[in-house]
Amino acid sequence: MSSALRSRARSASLGTTTQGWDPPPLRRPSRARRRQWMREAAQAAAQAAVQAAQAAAAQVAQAHVDEDEVVDLMTDEAGGGVTTLTTLSSVSTTTVLGHATFSACVRSDVMRDGEKEDAASDKENQRRPVVPSTSSRGSAASGDGYHGLRCRETSAMWSFEYDRDGDVTSVRRALFTGGSDPSDSVSGVRGGRKRPLRPPLVSLARTPLCRRRVGGVDAVLEENDVELRAESQDSAVASGPGRVPQPLSGSSGEESATAVEADSTSHDDVHCTCSNDQIITTSIRGLTCDPRMFLRLTHPELCELSISYLLVYVPKEDDFCHKICYAVDMSDESYRLGQGSFGEVWPLDRYRVVKVARKHSETVLTVWMSGLIRTRAAGEQQQPPSLVGTGVHRGLLTATGCCLLHNVTVHRRFHTDMFHHDQWKLACIDSYRRAFCTLADAIKFLNHQCRVCHFDITPMNVLIDVNPHNPSEIVRAALCDYSLSEPYPDYNERCVAVFQETGTARRIPNCSHRLRECYHPAFRPMPLQKLLICDPHARFPVAGLRRYCMSELSALGNVLGFCLMRLLDRRGLDEVRMGTEALLFKHAGAACRALENGKLTHCSDACLLILAAQMSYGACLLGEHGAALVSHTLRFVEAKMSSCRVRAFRRFYHECSQTMLHEYVRKNVERLLATSDGLYLYNAFRRTTSIICEEDLDGDCRQLFPE
């Protein structure tokens, strides 16, 4: 289930050091680098002009001394000589003023528009040399750290970037100590006119998360009046349970900060927004948000006030961290309910769990999906009384709360998931049919009404509640984990989450549809598996929007086959896990590791062997009805693959077919087909296994898991 996301700035433990430090400067694109070279050239020219003016002034001073000596020696001669000296002195003075004027002109060009000083300051600058700023991005008019913040405009958004460590420190020290703004001297008067004052806006520039360990326990630092919220894309929850990221430290200006890896690919996500009680100005062009919307919300909710954007407002209670984040017991790893590549799940109480994500992008996507599902499901059908207030809508699990500071989302607690469910009996086949019908309805709703593709349909992501008096009976099922979910292409650049906690708006990444990042390798639909085997760089074949839903239902069919094997194999669950499932997952781990290491050819080879195990599953459960599946797959491999890969495929298929024999399930299949619910599930599995090529994705999704 790994996802090759873009590299983000990560944080690491501060260790035993006590000295605070600031993050290194971000790398700039070539356009910004060219502008910087122009500034440096202008500053060098200005400095050279000033040095020339100083040298000329020294010559004039020496000329005055020589003039006095000459006048003393020539008191008896005619006044023509004195006139000559006076003329030379005038020429020298004119030269000095000319150099000074050139220096002022160069300095004015370097300064931004509207920041030229008045005539009095120009005269003052003529009498002192211009000291070039030590900051590579600072304004030439001032070397103060305040000008270490500059606006950078990209194709996606606007942002503020830090210049160097000293600039960041000076800015934060001024904020925390209540120091005056270095631009206040010219803020009221600019160009000889007073500027109208505007309401105060709070700058919420992204800063790294800070941590500090005191005696083995996290020390929660009090926040200052100026809330510089940490919104790092890769705050490392992965460093272990019980480690809580902390806000900025006190007014001394020293910070406990973690190491940050600067990567140019993260620049598109660096942003700065400003907000007050009436408006939230975002870094997304043409988008402003109303913070008063949060007053009536208790959960993330979609507010379709604009036709251009899908805005999900994410509220946060004032005591959320006290009641949720600090209430989670992470002292014992045995309490942990689940762990994956995207985060960890810990119990909060009897009815709720907390998901601690490894990346902020995971949390942002989760709450945006939650708000979208909750709002779209509200107008579809009434929620069952047992699910009111639980965050489960149309068979989809949603988050009921969120904290960006600690990267936490709150969800309803279920008994277990389908992968860990170990009580399977034919007597409860009616409950299994209800569960898979609920999941199929959830997938259709997600694709048709929400226009989002889940891309991670696995037994591990299907949460279930069982009857405590009959553990084999599934009472309730819900689909969860939207880590790999992507909106449809027509939603690109439109999906935004607005957070009350930080007063910021975060855009949801556009769809990429790389097949190697879609689905778990063992449950990937067969048409997509074949495309990935032929081309590791392949993307989802978007020839029509109905292909998304067909692909999702095909993946659900693979999950159904996984559960039917547990239900029908007469050898028992333990034998299925050690034999059949071990072969299915044998190469899935290798595919994920190869994908993480960027070895796409190795990932493709592993997926080829997984295809053999998937084919064996279908042949075992369907018997003679699976002959078409086997023959079509073998012809595809022989036509598309090299001889060595064909031999490897045949060897592994032979190994799987020796373990997955139809004789092990034949009698139980007959008993299954004797019931209407069993016949429904068996036919649903047959229809999904018939989706074996790209053209089959153009079918009618209503024929799969019909109502």
UniProtKB/Swiss-Prot annotation:
It holds the Pfam family UL97. It is found in: Virion. Its EC number is 2.7.11.1. Residues 113-127 have a biased composition (Basic and acidic residues). Autophosphorylates on serine and threonine residues. InterPro entries: Herpes_UL97, Kinase-like_dom_sf, Tyr_kinase_AS. Residues 1-14, 178-188 have a biased composition (Low complexity). It comes from the Viruses. The keyword Kinase applies. One of its GO terms (biological process) is viral process. Keywords: Host-virus interaction, Kinase, Modulation of host cell cycle by virus, Serine/threonine-protein kinase, Transferase, Virion. GO terms for cellular component: viral tegument. It catalyses: L-seryl-[protein] + ATP = O-phospho-L-seryl-[protein] + ADP + H(+); L-threonyl-[protein] + ATP = O-phospho-L-threonyl-[protein] + ADP + H(+). One of its GO terms (molecular function) is protein serine/threonine kinase activity. Residues 1-32, 113-147, 176-199, 231-264 are annotated as: Disordered. The active site is at D456 (proton acceptor). It is an enzyme of class 2 (transferase). Belongs to the protein kinase superfamily. Tyr protein kinase family. HCMV ganciclovir subfamily. Serine/threonine protein kinase that plays important roles in several processes including nuclear viral egress, viral replication or regulation of host cell cycle progression. Participates in the acquisition of tegument during virion morphogenesis in the nucleus. Redistributes the host nuclear lamina by phosphorylating cellular Lamins-A/C. Plays a role in viral DNA synthesis by phosphorylating the DNA polymerase processivity factor UL44. Stimulates host cell cycle to support viral DNA synthesis by phosphorylating host retinoblastoma/RB1 protein. Interacts with UL83. This is Serine/threonine protein kinase UL97. The gene is UL97.
